[in-house]
């Protein structure tokens, strides 16, 4: 196996992590599994092919195959049993068979092909075959592109873990520079600058597929512009935060490793800029997860009481304070007024506001009418200028926190996220109810949409009703509910057995990290930062899908490499060291 080629491939894989939902011409929906619409599918496909070739030719690639084989066979067995059981008891066949014929995009082409070569097949018969074959393919491909990819990366670097870590840190920093730079363009766009709007108009279709400037009730489209929320290069603002939950600890690790003060200062500035942009995402996912990761880092720093870690923590906290204050000032005085969910381009909106203000100032008829109504010309001009003012009135630290963090509780029905809260909590509660009704194997992988559609038929939530109407219009096999909680969804799909096996590698890693982090020793930094990256990206599964990006699986692979290279034992037992042990390890 050519290690230089592997290094290039792994660097490409790490670089591709932020680029989700690429232009449709580059999709690999048949072979790409859960990442068929993402750039990361290409290094994964190339890696699988090259690894299989090297193993076939040289017989020296796989490592610890017996351990992985036992796990993956057990995992696939549970998922396939769950699927077969779910299909056997599936109560919504009639709804699918009587649904729209185009709910499977490829079905008309397959029918035409079979008829063209003289094989007469009824549409419903082919649909029944498809209903079984499609979820089986989904189970196999997801396992292949997730746990299989983790094992592949582990085989690449099991004897040179430090090289994988160096590539990860360097390439992630490159991605962060790109994200920060594009995020500043987004800031200029939110400031109403037309050049930034034109730049986004040109580049977003190069980064993402199905771009639209107008809202479509039934069909998902990438927003060309994203109102008052900063999304940088990402598909949407929350994905910016999800990626940063993985990348921020790696950036901190890079800062910690630097020996040059100038490089350290430059990376701290990069962190401050990215924090500023994260605050401007106004995304609860982004803020909650990244604040939690920083809080855990602070606790670990005070636990270990190492000067370099405490100095880094102080630098990061200063950067957060500066970025938060800057974001508040920008939203109050520099941002074109906009509402979450608004589709109007902000530079165009600002231009229209200025033109309206100018027209009001020179319109004699309006001045005369204002005087008649008891408003002086001077007062009218003040009102005209206010119409063209930037910033949102009433924005301060308290209102921002109430809107973007406290709103996670879902208790305030008037906040901007109230509908989203209702959808998320309702769907997750329904997942849990479905799982408890089918506790052992769940309802079967990919078969949960019909159960949600039935149980939430009369739910008052506008977003939920939109998904219901979408299913009714396009069919259960083509439309459905968003994944609003990976762990609860997997519980509904695969029961306790499937969820337990899915989480088993993560639990083993978390316990191994805990065993290391609880000991006070000087070389704790690699374990601390890598564990934070893994915990940060894993926590996003509480409210979103784990396969939104490949970050979770990258963090898992690097975690196994780091811990294996340092001879950490992987067991499910754990004990806190005695005080004497802690002192000796220090």
Task: For every predicted segment, state its role.
Residues 88, 181, 186-194, 302-415, ...:
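A membrane-periplasm/extracellular boundary helix in multi-pass inner-membrane enzymes
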Residues 139-152, 164-228, 232-305, 309-312, ...:
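Alpha-helical transmembrane segments of multi-pass inner-membrane proteins
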């Amino acid at each position: 196996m050519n290690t230089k080629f592997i290094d290039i491939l792994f660097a490409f894989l790490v670089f591709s992590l932020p680029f989700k939902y690429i232009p449709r011409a580059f999709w690999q929906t048949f072979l790409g599994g859960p990442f068929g619409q993402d750039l990361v599918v290409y290094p994964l496909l190339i890696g699988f092919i090259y690894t299989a070739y090297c193993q076939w030719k040289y017989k020296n690639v796989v490592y610890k195959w017996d351990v992985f084989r036992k796990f993956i066979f057990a995992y696939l067995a549970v998922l396939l049993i769950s699927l077969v059981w779910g299909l056997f008891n599936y109560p919504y066949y009639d709804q699918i068979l009587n649904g729209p014929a185009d709910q499977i995009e490829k079905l008309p082409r397959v029918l035409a092909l079979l008829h063209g070569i003289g094989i007469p097949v009824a549409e419903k018969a082919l649909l029944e075959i498809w209903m079984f074959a499609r979820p089986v393919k989904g189970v196999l491909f997801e396992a292949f592109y997730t746990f299989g990819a983790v094992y592949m990366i582990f085989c690449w670097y099991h004897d040179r873990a430090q090289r994988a870590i160096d590539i990860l840190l360097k390439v992630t920093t490159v991605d962060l520079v790109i994200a920060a730079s594009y995020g500043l363009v987004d800031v200029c766009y939110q400031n109403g600058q037309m050049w930034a709007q034109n730049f986004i108009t040109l580049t977003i279709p190069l980064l993402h597929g199905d771009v639209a400037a107008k809202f479509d009730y039934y069909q998902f489209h990438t927003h060309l512009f994203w109102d008052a929320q900063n999304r940088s290069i990402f598909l949407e603002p929350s994905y910016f935060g999800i990626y940063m939950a993985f990348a921020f600890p790696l950036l901190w690790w890079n800062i910690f490793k630097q020996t040059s003060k100038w490089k350290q200062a430059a990376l701290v500035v990069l962190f401050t800029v990215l924090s500023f942009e994260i605050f401007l995402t106004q995304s609860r996912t982004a803020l909650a997860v990244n604040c939690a990761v920083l809080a855990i880092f602070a606790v670990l720093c005070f636990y270990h009481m190492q000067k370099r870690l405490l100095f880094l923590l102080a630098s990061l906290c200063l950067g957060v304070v500066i970025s938060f204050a800057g974001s508040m000032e920008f939203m109050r005085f520099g941002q074109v007024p906009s509402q979450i969910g608004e589709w109007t381009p902000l530079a165009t909106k600002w231009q229209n506001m200025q033109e309206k203000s100018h027209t009001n100032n020179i319109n004699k008829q309006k001045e005369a009418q204002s005087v008649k109504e008891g408003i002086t010309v001077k007062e009218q001009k003040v009102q005209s200028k206010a119409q063209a003012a930037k910033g949102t009135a009433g924005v301060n630290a308290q209102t921002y926190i109430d809107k973007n963090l406290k709103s996670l509780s879902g208790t305030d029905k008037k906040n901007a996220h109230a509908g989203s809260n209702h959808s998320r909590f309702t769907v997750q509660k329904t997942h849990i109810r479905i799982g408890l009704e089918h506790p052992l194997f769940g309802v079967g992988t990919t078969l949960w949409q019909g159960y949600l559609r039935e149980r939430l038929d009369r739910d008052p939530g506008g977003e939920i009703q939109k998904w219901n109407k979408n299913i009714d219009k396009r069919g259960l096999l083509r439309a459905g509910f968003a994944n609003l909680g990976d762990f609860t969804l997997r519980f509904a799909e695969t029961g306790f057995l499937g969820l337990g096996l899915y989480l088993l590698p993560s639990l083993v890693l978390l316990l191994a990290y805990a065993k290391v982090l609880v000991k006070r020793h000087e070389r704790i930094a690699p374990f601390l930062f890598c564990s934070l990256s893994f915990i940060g990206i894993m926590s996003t599964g509480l409210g979103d899908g784990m396969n939104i990006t490949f970050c979770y699986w990258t963090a898992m692979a690097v975690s196994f490499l780091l811990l294996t290279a340092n001879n950490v034992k992987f067991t499910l037992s754990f004990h806190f060291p005695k005080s004497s042990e802690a002192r000796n390890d220090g």
